[in-house]
Amino acid sequence: MHKIFSLILFLFPIHLVFIKIKNFLYDNNIIDPIKIDTKIISIGNVSLGGAGKTPFTIALSNFLKEKRGFSVGVVTRGYGRRNSHHNFLFNNHSWQDCGDEVIVLTNNLSRSIPVYISSNKILGAKELSSLGCDIVIL
């Protein structure tokens, strides 16, 4: 535990430098931000699996759709899938094609919530935005 804490303490200032550089580049219009014509909610954290991101995504998506009336779409990487295609999930996909997390999502999301599988979350968000989604959850 001590070694991990020491590593974090060492890397944290380096991380801050990169954040400052990134912010400088955006603030001075050296690089342009990516524009997507819908609201984006990014669910994530530093930890790996088991942090509750998938159940929270399901609960939030269903709440926004059913209780608030928003058109919601979900983008997922499809971790563990065998291919690297970018596509919408349809009922005839197996967990090998899309990853087991995606099967959990689609089995628990409202049927009218589209799920886009892609390692390129920008592409997925743009695809869902073009479908008319008010909110895209990453």
Annotate each language-model stretch with its function.
Residues 1-39:
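A transmembrane-helix-recognition feature enriched in membrane-embedded lipid enzymes
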Residues 76-138:
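P-loop/Walker-type NTP enzyme "switch/lid" segment
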Residues 1-10, 40-52, 125, 129:
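Charged, low-complexity, helix/coiled-coil-prone segments
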Residues 14, 54, 105:
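Residue-level signal for inorganic ion chemistry
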Residues 23-91:
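Walker A (P-loop) phosphate-binding motif
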